């Protein structure tokens, strides 16, 4: 249990996909103008990551990795070379289901997210979580924990940035830094803040 808590906490604070690995930056910068929209996207990312990472874990362990198809009589088969396209396919399918669900039941959030909801499909943070899961050889329970924690970490980062950007509307930002310029500086400072957690031994 302690091991799972370690994975969860590390994925939020120490190995934050947005602020430690700078994954998912396109959506992160584009949708972080309002806290409400950021929270909606953050919840969507949490849901997608919590589902896709363990599903891709099952896909990898029972179909793709070397010897995984021994149950089907193909023990020597190694399908890891199709891993990337397989993970993207799983992510695309789950995002499509989420998109249809939001369109039907929460149309206001669906309209607020706009084009950025389908863009979750190619959000490198989502794909990166699955690739980290494979690289670290997590089992199913660990992958659920890691997927949920990574989603929470990314959502926390985008909501924090949105809150800061809302406050900055009333700040006297130099003309050359207005817009994305000051946002990049803020993201860098936030990254330094999260870097302080790396000193925690877990």
UniProtKB/Swiss-Prot annotation:
It catalyses: a ubiquinone + n Na(+)(in) + NADH + H(+) = a ubiquinol + n Na(+)(out) + NAD(+). The keyword Cell membrane applies. Pfam families: Rnf-Nqr. GO terms for cellular component: Gram-negative-bacterium-type cell wall; plasma membrane. It is a multi-pass membrane protein. It is found in: Cell inner membrane. This is Na(+)-translocating NADH-quinone reductase subunit E. It comes from Maridesulfovibrio salexigens (strain ATCC 14822 / DSM 2638 / NCIMB 8403 / VKM B-1763). The lineage of its organism: Bacteria, Pseudomonadati, Thermodesulfobacteriota, Desulfovibrionia, Desulfovibrionales.
């Amino acid at each position: 249990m302690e091991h799972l808590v370690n994975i969860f906490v590390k994925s939020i604070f120490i190995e934050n996909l947005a602020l430690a690995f700078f994954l998912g930056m396109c959506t992160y910068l584009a949708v972080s103008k309002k806290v409400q929209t950021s929270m909606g996207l953050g919840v969507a990312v949490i849901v997608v990551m919590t589902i896709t990472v363990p599903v891709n874990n099952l896909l990898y362990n029972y179909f793709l990795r070397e010897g995984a198809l021994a149950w089907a009589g193909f023990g020597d088969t190694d399908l890891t070379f199709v891993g990337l396209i397989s993970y993207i396919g799983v992510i695309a399918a789950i995002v499509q289901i989420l998109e249809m669900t939001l369109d039907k039941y929460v149309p206001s959030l669906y309209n607020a997210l706009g084009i950025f909801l389908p863009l979750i499909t190619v959000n490198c943070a989502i794909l990166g979580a699955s690739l980290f899961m494979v690289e670290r050889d997590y089992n199913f329970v660990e992958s659920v924990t890691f997927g949920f924690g990574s989603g929470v970490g990314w959502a926390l980062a985008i909501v924090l940035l949105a809150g800061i950007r809302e406050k900055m509307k009333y700040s006297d930002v130099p003309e050359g830094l207005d817009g994305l310029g000051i946002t990049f500086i803020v993201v860098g400072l936030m990254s330094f803040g999260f870097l302080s957690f790396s000193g925690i031994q877990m």
